């Protein structure tokens, strides 16, 4: 079995390399699937990149912890003791040292040198910021819903995109590879990863996150192929008529600067969405969960430098009553469980799935 998997993976790597060398190669199977089941939804740039990732970009299974925002907003339930500042804690593409889609735990990193700041009156009092490593620079972590208004200003740092080394595996390959913590030794052998590699802790963390129980009222799944990602999102939302909403950000990232909101568009199809976050793994794995009662937006912003314009997808959680009272968002925003909505952006490559809303003819 192991030899069979190795052969499949080798074939996949050859295909990835060929795709990177041939500008007009045939579309990947996942791309064909997407166009068939989501004909009215163009492939987001980040997803297309995962399907046609040049081999030259895939130099390591390990993501650089320095190229991450300060928090990982995917888990509102983990205890602060679960979050370590070490380089072995490698989070998803653009995610950081905290899991902030975890609903039942405090999020404080032991030994961190980051300084947390309350909302600033100079920036309309709408966001919570943090200075990294003792530096004076600050970047938005969480923000109040009132920040999602034209004219509001927020500082953001967008790190470079760091997709999984192998991108999306073909479905038949992904389905053939075990995906459990119990099978981790065999998984490492399949990928030729040493047991003492710095990749291992992040892989194990991803597997454990996918196996962890959900809170009341939440649906969660992990998808190891593009086909599984789309089909599972359809199943959770109860319809095949769905669409993806993503942030439009530069792949190379953008330096910290103050952005001004110039346009806001609510995302229809709520109040429950499916949020998907790519996890640290040799190939692309998305961990997805229902957001609970939420409002979602696409927000157009212009940077202080003039030329830097971005569009972020943002989620505002309107019911935080089940979140841990010690969650860092409450500390930064000065609120509490069941209080005002808590908002955060979706980094590059992360996806909000929403039901398509059909309007009646006027």
Curated annotation (Swiss-Prot):
Record's keyword annotation contains 4Fe-4S = no
What InterPro entries does the database record attribute to this sequence? Answer: BURP, BURP_dom
> Where is this chain compositionally biased, Basic and acidic residues type?
63-86
PROSITE patterns (alphabetical) = BURP (PS51277)
Q: Which residues are glycosylated?
A: 102
Could you tell me which residues belong to the region Disordered? Answer: 58-94
Spell out the Pfam families in the cross-references: BURP (PF03181)
The GO annotation for biological process reads: pollen development; pollen maturation
Give every BURP domain span: 142-356
Which key words are in the record?
Glycoprotein, Signal
Kindly indicate where the leader peptide sits in this chain: 1-20
Q: In which tissues is it expressed?
A: Specifically expressed in anthers, in the tapetum and microspores (at protein level).
**One CC-aspect GO term:** exine
Q: From which domain of life does this come?
A: Eukaryota
Keyword hit for Signal? yes
Q: What does this protein do?
A: Required for pollen development. Probably synthesized in the tapetum, packaged in Ubisch bodies and transported at appropriate stages to the micropsores.
Q: What is this protein called?
A: Protein RAFTIN 1B
The record lists the organism as: Triticum aestivum
